[in-house]
Amino acid sequence: MSRYRGPRVRIIRRLGTLPGLTNKTSQLKSSSINQSISNKKISQYRIRLEEKQKLRFHYGITERQLLNYVRIARKAKGSTGEVLLQLLEMRSDNVIFRLGMAPTIPGARQLVNHRHILVNDCIVDIPSYRCKPQDFITIKNQRKSETMISKNIELYQKSKIPNHLTYSSLEKKGLVNQILDRESIGLKINELLVVEYYSRQA
């Protein structure tokens, strides 16, 4: 299944707020759930499916990519669900988004694809590149890159940067301090339901 490129508001009306997909919010989710519950009992499969879809649309990845991340998480030590979230959160496009250098993950992915971003002084043009503790993220030394990202930071770096990241406005540099903990996830999600959804595939 390819990456979704359709109307984003339609998705958040169905799944609720997804800050990685769009900075718009929807007030329709809770009422639609209540009406659905009153009409018929929601199946466990649908509940798991919706949690999986939240994860996929928030991080902007394909079905195949998400399944691969689940398989990697199953082989790692620790809670499969927590490891899965850590893998997704440490993607370069998500790190750039969480630093406030882009308004959304699709916006961050575009910065990476267009070679505006450096990790440890090397251009990274692969959005799925996995950042590691002590990696530092900087802007390509070109006026266009600096102007674009500085404007994004001014507009979108409003919320608190999560504890596993820091950003220096003076140096225009982001730093990955550590692997993030569960409390720092920027999405309301029940990752165990996602793991259960893939239990027969991963």
From Swiss-Prot:
Per UniProt, residues of the S4 RNA-binding domain are 90-158
Q: Which GO terms describe its cellular component?
A: chloroplast; small ribosomal subunit
Its localization reads: Plastid, Chloroplast
- Give all cystine bridges in this chain: none
Q: Which Pfam families match?
A: Ribosomal_S4, S4
Please state the protein's primary subcellular location: plastid
Alphabetized, the UniProt keywords read:
Chloroplast, Plastid, Ribonucleoprotein, Ribosomal protein, RNA-binding, rRNA-binding
GO annotation, biological process: ribosomal small subunit biogenesis; translation
Q: Which InterPro entries match?
A: Ribosomal_uS4, Ribosomal_uS4_bac-type, Ribosomal_uS4_N, S4_RNA-bd, S4_RNA-bd_sf
Q: Tell me its family.
A: Belongs to the universal ribosomal protein uS4 family.
Subunit-level organization: Part of the 30S ribosomal subunit. Contacts protein S5. The interaction surface between S4 and S5 is involved in control of translational fidelity.
Q: What is this protein called?
A: Small ribosomal subunit protein uS4c
